[in-house]
A protein has these predicted regions:
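C-terminal transmembrane helical hairpin of 12-TM major facilitator-type secondary transporters
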Residues: 280-324
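Intracellular juxtamembrane helix-capping segments at the cytosolic ends
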Residues: 126-138, 319-333
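Cytoplasmic helix-loop-helix junction between adjacent transmembrane helices
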Residues: 109, 115-154
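Conserved MFS/SLC helix-loop-helix module at the cytosolic interface between two early adjacent transmembrane helices
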Residues: 71-107
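Helix-breaking motifs and short loop linkers at transmembrane-helix boundaries and internal kinks
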Residues: 52, 84, 105-111, 299-301
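C-terminal membrane-cytosol helix-exit motif in multi-pass small-molecule transporters
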Residues: 182-202, 385-389
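Helix-to-loop junctions at the C-terminal end of transmembrane segments
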Residues: 72-85, 266-278, 363
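Paired small-residue
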Residues: 95, 99-102, 110-119, 304-312
Length: 398
């Protein structure tokens, strides 16, 4: 397994092997960011008494992180786009290390919340960089696979990292869990400096204004698909527990385990297909999501149908972000990918917020049975845009 990296600021030759060590370092950065964001959600009963607040206010630690990431992605990316890329990446990782260390030792909820805001800002910066960084490390015909490797860190964090972190905190304490997460970020700094190549920032004369990047051919379509897919997905995923109970299946943990395991398979399949069959694979994934929502709406009361549908949902959704992200980098070009991805990060977080709100309104107004019917038209819009916008989602990679 080669770990060869290209020289600083140069594109690798087409025959060069994948820089596995560098790509895995970026994937671990994605893993660390997701685990930092979501770990408090599994630790509500443990953190609340130690910080002297309710469990709901511990939940706000996740909300605050997400809002900071949403707010910081575009302005921080615009501010830092002229700097060399690797120091910015290292700075974001050091921010994770410091903020998680503060959470580990803090006895003040206000200080903990402030540390979470800092972590969210670092997360917004990191997400804007990762896909473009991966794309610059490999030849054009391998971009999709490189991005899939990096974004696999998200899937592994959701499927394995958060449950494992929650279990670890139950054994060694939540403060130790955050301390270990801080240590992981420090180790990752060394890994990045050792194996991830450096790239220059944008020169002043080469910088394209944000509005022009947003208007590049294909970008609006990619952002639209991101928004509608995330809203539809979150309508169901946020309220999967009440929906499973509505369907007469009380084992929510099993439902989430099936979904998480299927996402790992989905991203592996995507890594194989993305560079050769981007558009057909994305159309198939979105069509499968739509069929799953229809099946959940019609026959979720049958346990076998519920679990099979959830597995197919995870299979389809697991690879969709990689496919969409690859299309975004193709549309923007690797040199402008950080700016384009900052836009997508904002849209992504907006989709999560709107989807959670929409699902909550549907649940309160019509009950859990309405959730798949609410999600279905949103996923269908994403499918329709992908089908029509052939320029944004080409059948084969450019």
């Amino acid at each position: 397994m080669s770990t060869t990296c290209p020289a600083k600021g140069t594109a690798p030759p087409a025959s060069a092997p994948l820089p596995w060590s560098g790509l895995l370092a970026l994937s671990t950065a994605a893993f660390t960011a997701v685990l930092t964001e979501l770990l408090p959600a599994g630790l509500l009963p443990r953190m609340a008494p130690d910080l002297g607040v309710t469990e709901a206010r511990i939940g706000f630690l996740v909300t605050g992180y997400a809002l900071a990431s949403f707010a910081a992605a575009i302005p921080l990316t615009a501010l830092l786009r002229g700097l060399p890329r690797r120091p910015v990446l290292v700075g974001a990782l050091l921010g994770f290390a410091v903020s998680n260390a503060v959470v580990a030792v803090s006895s003040s909820y206000a200080l903990t919340f402030g540390a979470r805001l800092v972590a969210g800002g670092m997360g917004g910066t990191l997400w804007a960089m990762l896909a473009g960084y991966a794309a610059r490390m490999v030849p054009a015909e391998r971009r999709g696979r490189a991005i899939a490797i990096v974004l696999a860190g998200i899937t592994l964090a959701l499927a394995l990292g958060v449950p494992a972190g929650t279990a670890l905190a139950g054994t060694v304490g939540w403060r130790t869990a955050f301390g270990l997460l801080s240590g992981l970020a420090v180790l990752l700094v060394g890994w990045v400096r050792w194996r991830v190549p450096g790239f220059p920032g944008e020169t002043p004369h080469a910088r394209v204004p944000l509005a022009r990047v947003a208007a590049l051919p294909g970008i609006p379509a990619v952002l639209s698909v991101t928004l509608f897919l995330l809203v539809g997905h979150q309508v169901m995923y946020t309220y999967v527990a009440p929906f499973a109970a509505h369907a007469g299946f009380g084992r929510t943990g099993l439902v989430l385990l099936v979904f998480g395991a299927a996402t790992v398979v989905g991203i592996w399949i995507t890594g194989v297909l993305v560079d050769r069959r981007l558009r057909p694979t994305l159309v198939g994934a979105l069509a499968l999501c739509a069929v799953v929502m229809l099946a959940l709406g019609l026959a979720a009361g049958v346990p076998g149908v519920l679990l099979i549908s959830v597995a197919l949902w995870g299979l389809a959704f697991g690879g969709a972000p990689t496919l969409i992200q690859t299309a975004l980098v193709d549309a923007s070009g690797p040199e402008r990918a950080d700016v384009a991805t900052s836009l997508q990060t904002t849209v992504y977080n907006a989709g999560i917020a709107v989807g959670s709100l929409t699902g909550g309104l549907a649940l309160d107004g019509w009950g859990a049975g309405a959730l798949p019917w609410t999600a279905l038209p949103l996923v269908a819009v994403a499918l329709g845009v992908t089908t029509v916008a052939r320029n944004a989602f080409p059948a084969t990679r450019r």
